């Protein structure tokens, strides 16, 4: 069988190439060799959360794997079959649970049965989507493909202690994924959010929310509905400490766009709230139906769906363009066209391969 070769330093050269390559290998059951893994990063090679994604997909597909250790620059992955089931994976650090979800979800969707996956690690950590973005924006938008997924949050995990606990519940696809055709967002309908603070005073979450709401009212003329999540001392189940806020907008096209920010030591809660609001406003300003982060997460699903998908994204990022390049290597029979320049809003048109479970 032909082995697909992926240069891990292509495009943005980060862990995303590894996640998408392994994800496509697991879905298509094509073996892959990935080299120069995270070559452009200051600490190249596999990190613990990447290793968790490798081991998770190894278990889900009974794969033969070589090179799966922290620091490894090369990995060989040969999947045998896709198995639904109940799984549990512990990253063992504050490594991102949401990036592991990104890697394993396509394989589980194309398995012939229901799956439940418990993942222990970081839920709200730098350089990855926060868990509330995944719960309220990512899986919400995946509905358009006919995908039925839930993410349950039982405990938050922040850097450096981690310890978060999430459960991914996946109903298998009954047939080919539906293509999507959603370009412009249309009118803004409403804005929601969740502002959390764990192992910290309640006023941290309240100040984040208040600051975000002030910016949204001033710039958009909308009153957002932001939930406050905090816990009384002595009854806080989290390791913490940590805080963050995720905002999301419902729009006329039926999609959701998000904006988020994380708290950090020495960073005022008001700044956290303002950052999230300004990010959301920036995403909405393009007039497109999907935000820049959703843009790159849509790509594998557009390639795997049956027929032509068209999506309007607020920004054509490096991540999105790299996701397209990796997808084309695994699915050469697909057709892609992009209107727009890198760093600007764009329209992505992909004629998917219509993979069946």
Swiss-Prot record:
| GO cellular component, as recorded | cytoplasm
Identify the InterPro entries for this entry: RNA3'-term_phos_cycl_insert (IPR013791), RNA3'_phos_cyclase_dom (IPR023797), RNA3'_phos_cyclase_dom_sf (IPR037136), RNA3'_term_phos_cyc (IPR000228), RNA3'_term_phos_cyc_type_1 (IPR017770), RNA3'_term_phos_cycl-like_CS (IPR020719), RNA3'P_cycl/enolpyr_Trfase_a/b (IPR013792), RPTC_insert (IPR036553)
* One GO BP annotation of this record: RNA processing
Q: Which reaction does it catalyse?
A: a 3'-end 3'-phospho-ribonucleotide-RNA + ATP = a 3'-end 2',3'-cyclophospho-ribonucleotide-RNA + AMP + diphosphate
Name the EC number(s): 6.5.1.4
What CDD domains does the database record attribute to this sequence? RNA_Cyclase_Class_II (cd00874)
Q: Which UniProt keywords apply?
A: ATP-binding, Cytoplasm, Ligase, Nucleotide-binding
Q: Where is the active site?
A: 319 (tele-amp-histidine intermediate)
Q: Report whether Cell division shows up as a keyword of the record.
A: no
Q: Is Transmembrane helix tagged as a keyword? A: no
List locations, semicolon-separated. Cytoplasm
Residues binding ATP are 102, 293-296
Which EC class, in a word?
Answer: ligase
Coarse class of the primary localization is: cytoplasm
What's one GO MF term for it?
A: RNA-3'-phosphate cyclase activity
What is the recorded function of this protein according to its Swiss-Prot or TrEMBL entry?
A: Catalyzes the conversion of 3'-phosphate to a 2',3'-cyclic phosphodiester at the end of RNA. The mechanism of action of the enzyme occurs in 3 steps: (A) adenylation of the enzyme by ATP; (B) transfer of adenylate to an RNA-N3'P to produce RNA-N3'PP5'A; (C) and attack of the adjacent 2'-hydroxyl on the 3'-phosphorus in the diester linkage to produce the cyclic end product. The biological role of this enzyme is unknown but it is likely to function in some aspects of cellular RNA processing.
The UniProt entry's sequence similarity note says: Belongs to the RNA 3'-terminal cyclase family. Type 1 subfamily.
This chain's protein is named RNA 3'-terminal phosphate cyclase
In the UniProt record, the gene name given for this protein reads: rtcA
